[in-house]
Design a protein with these regions (language model features):
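Acidic, polar-rich N-terminal leader regions of halophilic archaeal proteins
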Residues: 1-164
Length: 164
């Protein structure tokens, strides 16, 4: 664990969830990189609320904490591309741009564990792959986190504003 990514205030996975996601260390009761978990929670909630640009910013600000070649970097960079692709699709109706970003996201997410920091990465990869042929699969799709599909509240939007 790196000291610059520690944060004891970051909550553990849901206690009623029957999985231990990659990134959670049950022996220490901490996330390997708590700031990554915080960015994941915020970024997923914002994405699921349709705030794709803000979601992108959450993942991007965390991505810079990791050196290239690490799983953390690949995951964060992939999620940046996921949010940017959705932004292109929904806000600009630019499906060619979406496809380009999703193809890059799939490259980054290729070797990331299927359940990384609570995100159902397998579902993300499957949805992106399907969206390359049929962008309408994104309509109503939300990212699963800890077995749920949470949305943003005022706290997440306030955090995103502070990133700008």
């Amino acid at each position: 664990m790196d000291d610059h990514t520690r944060d004891p205030s970051v909550d553990p996975p849901r206690p009623d969830w029957d999985r231990t996601p990659t990134g959670w260390n049950p022996e220490t009761g901490e996330w390997d990189h708590a700031t990554l978990r915080r960015a994941v929670v915020l970024g997923v909630r914002l994405y699921n609320s349709g705030a794709f640009h803000e979601s992108h910013d959450c993942f991007e600000s965390e991505w810079y904490n990791y050196g290239s070649g690490t799983t953390e970097s690949a995951f964060a960079h992939g999620m940046v591309q996921v949010a940017a692709g959705a932004y292109k699709h929904f806000d600009f109706e630019n499906d060619d741009g979406m496809r380009s970003l999703f193809e890059t996201a799939l490259q980054y997410l290729h070797s990331v564990p299927n359940d990384y920091y609570g995100v159902d990465v397998l579902d993300v990869r499957t949805t992106l792959t399907n969206a390359l042929d049929d962008p309408t699969v994104l309509d109503g799709w939300q990212i699963e986190l800890d077995g749920r599909r949470p949305e943003a509240g005022p706290e997440e939007y306030e955090h995103a504003e502070r990133l700008e």
